């Protein structure tokens, strides 16, 4: 145990050899989340409306106030203006054309997705007016909320980035420092020392796990501070991350052992981290996309990790179709990664041919 403690202490001292890489690996996902949360789509859209001069215009304003989620915020925030010119924004004006009242919406945007969202909200407001005029013959819509309260998309986005933060820290730092052992010639110490290689690898994996948890905790804290929503179990969320951290650590260390160079190891970790994040339910649950994409996404370890974390942020709602299969999948990936790391370490460090 004392020898393991000395190995672990030596691993942490390696921070001094690459402090910038440590900061990039640990803080990059959190900084990315903070920036993305500022520009991300929100449920409530500002809609500029020319001050109404008719009773229909006043009714339209009232209808706008009714458009929203039954368990969440309004979808439209009306802003009354006097100038019908949209400028670089958008404006709605109730006008008379051929004796008929028309809601004229003028856009100064080039963002087609934002225009689509604003048109949908205007249609919803007009549907409210239409239903009032139709009376008993109006279109009846029954809404059945899936959750007690609406949760903003920034929560899902941040939750899905927690595995990214853990993976990136473990893979990038593991690969970079392992490659440095070859570049600096210190790999000879591992080849000649009497300490068993499982103990050496255990110290490296333990250190990477602590670093990965640090990156994930930082992102988790900013997720809670920005959205005001915290998981129902902090411990459960981070226990779920353990298989992914071990997988990432093994991939990073193996990259360093194979390439013997810091830059390729750095790039392999970066590319694999973002590929796993993008394909592995980074922007939405895999079940919400095409069948082909879902099948590919379920091959990525991030997807079962996110599905297991989901209930702790979304009132206990389960989304994993096959929880047992997902657990077995992660166990299999983890065991394969550990075996692969041992094999590569033996070939690249302990082999007599080296």
Please state what every model-predicted region is:
Residues 1-152, 325, 354:
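Extracytoplasmic/periplasmic domains immediately adjacent to an N-terminal transmembrane anchor
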Residues 6-44, 155-173, 213-216, 273-278, ...:
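Hydrophobic alpha-helical transmembrane segments of multi-pass membrane transport/permease proteins
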Residues 9, 15, 41-42, 313-317, ...:
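Junction motif at the cytosolic side of a transmembrane helix
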Residues 33-44, 259-302:
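Transmembrane helix segments
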Residues 41-47, 147-177, 245-257, 339-346:
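Hydrophobic alpha-helical transmembrane segments of membrane proteins
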Residues 84-87, 286-328:
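Short hydrophobic, aromatic-rich alpha-helical segments embedded in or entering the lipid bilayer
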Residues 150-223:
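Hydrophobic alpha-helical transmembrane segments of multi-pass membrane transport proteins
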Residues 197-270, 274-277, 324-327, 332, ...:
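Alpha-helical transmembrane segments and their short interhelical loops
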């Amino acid at each position: 145990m004392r020898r393991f403690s000395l190995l672990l202490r030596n691993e942490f001292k390696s921070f001094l050899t690459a402090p910038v890489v440590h900061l990039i690996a640990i803080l990059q996902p959190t900084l990315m989340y903070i920036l993305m949360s500022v520009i991300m789509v929100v449920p409530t859209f500002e809609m500029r409306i020319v001050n109404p001069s008719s009773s229909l215009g006043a009714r339209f304003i009232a209808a706008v106030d009714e458009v929203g989620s039954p368990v969440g915020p309004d979808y439209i925030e009306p802003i009354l203006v006097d100038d019908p010119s949209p400028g670089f924004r958008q404006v709605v004006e109730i006008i008379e054309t051929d004796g008929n009242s028309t809601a004229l919406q003028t856009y100064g945007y080039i963002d087609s997705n934002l225009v689509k969202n604003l048109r949908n909200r205007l249609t919803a407001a007009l549907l409210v007016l239409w239903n009032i005029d139709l009376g008993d013959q109006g279109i009846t819509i029954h809404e059945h909320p899936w959750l007690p309260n609406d949760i903003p998309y920034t929560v899902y986005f941040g939750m899905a980035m927690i595995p990214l933060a853990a993976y990136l820290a473990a893979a990038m730092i593991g690969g970079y420092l392992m490659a440095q052992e070859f570049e600096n010639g210190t790999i000879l110490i591992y080849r000649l020392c009497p300490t068993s290689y499982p103990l050496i690898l255990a110290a490296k994996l333990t250190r990477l796990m602590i670093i990965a948890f640090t990156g994930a905790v930082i992102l988790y804290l900013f997720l809670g501070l920005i959205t005001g929503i915290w998981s129902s179990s902090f411990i459960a969320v981070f226990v779920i991350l353990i298989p992914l951290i071990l997988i990432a650590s093994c991939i990073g260390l193996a990259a360093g052992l194979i390439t013997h160079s810091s830059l390729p190891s750095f790039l392999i970790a970066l590319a694999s981290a973002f590929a796993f994040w993008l394909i592995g339910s980074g922007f939405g649950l895999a079940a919400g996309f095409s069948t082909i994409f879902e099948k590919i996404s379920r091959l990525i370890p991030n997807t079962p990790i996110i599905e297991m974390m989901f209930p702790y942020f979304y009132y206990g709602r389960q989304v994993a179709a096959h929880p047992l299969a997902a657990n077995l999948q992660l166990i299999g990936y983890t065991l394969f990664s550990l075996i692969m790391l041992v094999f590569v370490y033996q070939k690249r460090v302990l082999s007599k041919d080296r």
